[in-house]
Amino acid sequence: MATEIDLLRDQKDKLNDILRQHQIEHIFRDPTMQNSMSKGGRGDTLVDSINEQSSLPPLIAEYEKHLEELNRQLTYYQKHMGEMKLQLETVITENERLHSKLKDAVEKQLEALPFGTGIGNDICADDETVRILQEQLQLANQEKTWALELWQTASQELQSVQKLYQEHMTEAQIHEFENRKQKDQLNNFQQLTKKLHVANENIEMTNHHFLKTVTEQNMEIEKLRKHLRQARLDLRVAVSKVEELTKVTEGLQEQMLKKEEDIMSAQGKEEASDRRVQQLQSSIKQLESRLCVAIEEADVLKTGKSNLEKQIKELQAKCSESENEKYEAISRARDSMQLLEEANIKQNQILLEEKQKEVDREKMKKTMSQLIQDAAIKARKEVESTKKQYEILISQLKEELSTLQMDCDEKQGQIDRAIRGKRAVEEELEKIYREGKQDESDYRKLEEMHQRCLAAERSKDDLQLRLKSAENRIKQLEINSSEEMSRSHEMIQKLQTVLESERENCGFVSEQRLKLQQENEQLQKETEDLRKVALEAQKKAKLKVSTMEHQFSIKEHGFEVQLREMEDSNRNSIVELRHLLAAQQKTANRWKEETKKLTESAEMRISSLKSELSRQKLHTQELLSQLEMANEKVAENEKLILEHQEKANRLQRRLSQAEERAASASQQLSVITVQRRKAASMMNLENI
């Protein structure tokens, strides 16, 4: 199991390294993309980078599927282990119930046994039965010790299996936590790509808007230039006409002088000249009207110039507003930096709290392990001490029984002797009564015999009292032994309850540990969210500042160009337009070259990613084979657990059999003692 876990960890580390490399590549790509945006590439490089990022999701999806399969298998194993635990608990409860039932049945059978059937058995048979029962007791004790040893070994093996399961569970939790982190990172990258898309769209919109405004202004400027040209042409025509009219007026004046000289001679011609003068006056009026129109057009041009000056002032005001916005963006950036510093401080505090919590967890683990070890040691010591005490008590009881049996045999011999002496004395008394009264010596003999009889009766009474006291002592010893047995059972039950309570405490501690882990995960997520918010704020501030600076620079450049165009002549504007066309052609060529390079790099990356996909598929196949091996090992472990359960059941059966044998032996001893007492009482009655 440990080797398989190490292999899984190595493979997961490799996959994490590959993902980190991809992430680092994309992070290094972003500033190049921004530089290309600032130089003139703007949207195309971002589109190419996004197309490159679109090749990553299949790898990530396969990795997530593989992790989900592993998590499902872990949940299946957890459920299976829980079911096994429940089955073990049910088996233990059934064994206890059967043990109690057998004990009650044996006690009832022993109580139902009839007494007084074997009163006339011999003492030798009783001794043999006692010896056989003692041997059975010794064998039962040996089997009990052997069963306890096997039970301890089985419990140790179960503890080792539980430790392995806990280690596997902790590693699975670590895998899940790392998977969550990776998913969060992927979500962050996706959000960043979306934001870059939005930023690119905004930049494109601003560029389109700026181009539209530039084209509109150029159109207006061209219209104004056309109007100026037309006005200048009209002025030139009007000036030429005025010159012509002045020349005509001079010629007319000369002609008038000539005509004044020739008035008298050319009266007929005066009417024609008057007509011509009227025509000339009408033409002059027309020229004057044209001059008025030209003056009005000049006034219109002056008003247009004033409007342009107003627009320039408005643009200057907008520039000042944009500068104010720039200062506001800088202040916002400063605020975001302060927020970042506060977030870093909170993060450090959270890390310190996490370290303290980890130290507290380690302390709790140590204390719990010490408590469990102390409880186990105490339980073992108490069991061993109680076992030794019971063994000592059993040996003492055996010694006392042997001494009491010896005393009983001696006392029975004395009683038999006293009975024989009594019979002999009674026979002698009968002989004396038959023969009649004899000498005083015979009378003395009778008195001595009578005193002997009295002494024998006294000794008989003393022996009976001693027998009663011995029987009472045996009863007290039996009562004490039963009380001590009950106390030992109570102690064992108390120890079992203590063990169960400690197990519950361990479960409660594990739950608290899980809660603390969840709290730590939540805190880490909050810190990551704060970091993300701070980074997003920084990025937004930087983007705003860069966009504002770019806009200001573009606007300033545009205003300068407009002013220069208004001041310069048409030639400069044509030259600038040619330069702009050449620059656009150059940028278009550059974009084409960059797109070719990016397509080649994308194809190379796609080929490398395909090779990595094939490698990862091989890794997944290896992982599947390892999972099959793990499943086989789990099946083997289940078989071992079943074998241990069978061994435990056998041990419990042997323990129950040993207890039944001990109970039967104790009952047989009690029956034998009762039979002996009854035999003694019957003998006494017969003698009386």
Swiss-Prot record:
Tell me which Gene Ontology terms the entry assigns under biological process: cilium assembly; clustering of voltage-gated sodium channels
Q: Which residues carry this modification: Phosphoserine?
A: S681
Stretches of the chain forming a coiled coil according to its record? 59-108, 152-673
Q: Work out whether the entry's keyword set contains Cell cycle.
A: no
Quote the subcellular location field of this record. Answer: Cytoplasm, Cytoskeleton, Microtubule organizing center, Centrosome, Centriole
Keywords for this protein: Acetylation, Coiled coil, Cytoplasm, Cytoskeleton, Phosphoprotein
What residues bear N-acetylalanine in this entry?
Answer: A2
Where would you say this protein principally sits, based on its record? cytoplasm
Q: Which InterPro entries match?
A: SCLT1 (IPR038911)
Record function comment:
Adapter protein that links SCN10A to clathrin. Regulates SCN10A channel activity, possibly by promoting channel internalization.
Assembly description = Interacts with SCN10A and clathrin. Identified in a complex containing SCN10A, clathrin and SCLT1.
Q: What is this protein called?
A: Sodium channel and clathrin linker 1
State the organism of origin. Answer: Mus musculus
Q: Which gene encodes it?
A: Sclt1
